[in-house]
Amino acid sequence: MTLLLSIATSAFALPFGPQSALVIDESSGQILLEKNADNIVPIASLTKLMTAMVVLDAKQDMDALISIDEQDVDTIKHSTSRVPVGASLPRKDVLQLALMSSDNRAAASLARTYPGGKEAFVTAVHAKLLALGMAHTTIEEPTGLSFHNTSTASDLVKMALAASNYADITRITTDSRDMINIKGRQVEYHNTNGFVGKKGWDIMLSKTGYTIEAGRCIIMKIKAAGKNVIMVLLNAGASSTRNRDAMNVRRFLSDEKVAVAKTSRHNRARV
């Protein structure tokens, strides 16, 4: 496994856990870091960035209430949710929960209430994938719970670039927390990305993902060394690994010392 830095000639070995990764300079499109960027892998809740774009493209009333239904309950992984069946929320709050807190019921309800229903939603997703040139991506449902939702780091960079053009998505995914009215009670929800709001991080887009099949995944748009950078890290074995590698990418791009962890020579990246 190697991580290639296209503009570097150094043979410095960077410990790197994710199985696939791609980091690019947004303005130039230049590849800064790359590892197995064309491998097709499950993407878990990174899916929700696509869900959000398709929902926003439909230009529905964001103040209209959505009632969480039994149909929205996860029957794939049987994941829990802090949004109870029967709760009614404005669509804008449902979108907030789907993106910031990665709530699966929220994402499912957005697809269910899409004009024409879930079938029309999936059709719109396929059209969006085609429009973005994401030829190696398959999305069959809105949450990412299905391991059939797959993509490549290369395709996900395209998705991140597109999502960065949606003000609602960038605002929501960079909120560290929010209070949402659930059945008359104010409930605090937090961003699944602990780097959001953390000192030293200038984050302009964020989404995490996890399933057993997908491992720990993250997409971020950050500012590093004066550049706007898109970072996609896929299939890390643990949150700590994913987070260490995200920090190492930022430090490396900023010419700072990277954090070293014990790693075999087969899991080192050459940069």
Residue ranges and their predicted role:
Residues 11-154, 158-167:
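Active-site-adjacent loops and short helices of periplasmic peptidoglycan-processing enzymes
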Residues 15-19, 91-92, 116-271:
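Penicillin-recognizing serine hydrolase domain
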